[in-house]
């Protein structure tokens, strides 16, 4: 398979590895992006790719709760200037109120619904675009319902750059639920517990860690023990309950929550622009600098 400059650029953005290393990784894996990431990790050249790395899109996240329902949403704009605009922030809050009341199941359903003003959600956004002069998009949202004995936690970081909604069961207070949300904003876990990690992801991580150990020249008879030890670190990276609690690193999140008589049922973490447009380095200049060295 022909390795294109665009493929090399994408792999660089995902891993932070050098251009020539990325080209070699893609060549060795016949252009398979995921296998190329693993190849770089096995060689110790790159860490695991972060999906939210190098975000450039603007906008804000917002959370609203009422009774036993909560909504978290992300609305994008083209510039940070507009995201801080009072009219934009009012629009976000009005969209949140509508979503919380109507509880649409999908984004398409939400955009087609009629608001209290008589306009559809899409028309309401279009009217704001005409006034503000910039493209505005309702990117995503989630409506969460809880039982009477459950507690929501809401945390907005940097004016909504990151938004986290948690749902705790048991005797948790809103303060505990918010503390957990704050931790999630900072540490970015992917799952609540080990039970949620897909077996395919564990198998892939195990294989990468095994190859890392073998490439380090470790004897095969101790490789498995090393893999198990490093898997523990993997779980600490991706599982909320395994992580050292950000406000008291002497205890894990599991210990902190259980000491309050609670359990974590669910969390949703939105970061503005994650997975969208990425920072553009001057790729042409880097290519030229590499060519000159040859």
From Swiss-Prot:
The keyword Cytoplasm applies. Belongs to the EF-Ts family. Residues 79-82 are annotated as: Involved in Mg(2+) ion dislocation from EF-Tu. It is found in: Cytoplasm. Associates with the EF-Tu.GDP complex and induces the exchange of GDP to GTP. It remains bound to the aminoacyl-tRNA.EF-Tu.GTP complex up to the GTP hydrolysis stage on the ribosome. This is Elongation factor Ts. It holds the Pfam family EF_TS. The gene is tsf. PANTHER family: ELONGATION FACTOR TS, ELONGATION FACTOR TS, MITOCHONDRIAL. NCBIfam families: tsf (TIGR00116). GO terms for molecular function: translation elongation factor activity. Gene3D superfamilies: 1.10.286.20, DNA helicase RuvA subunit, C-terminal domain, Elongation factor Ts, dimerisation domain. Keywords: Cytoplasm, Elongation factor, Protein biosynthesis. It comes from Geobacillus thermodenitrificans (strain NG80-2). GO terms for cellular component: cytoplasm. InterPro entries: EF-Ts_dimer_sf (IPR036402), Transl_elong_EFTs/EF1B (IPR001816), Transl_elong_EFTs/EF1B_dimer (IPR014039), Transl_elong_Ts_CS (IPR018101), UBA-like_sf (IPR009060).
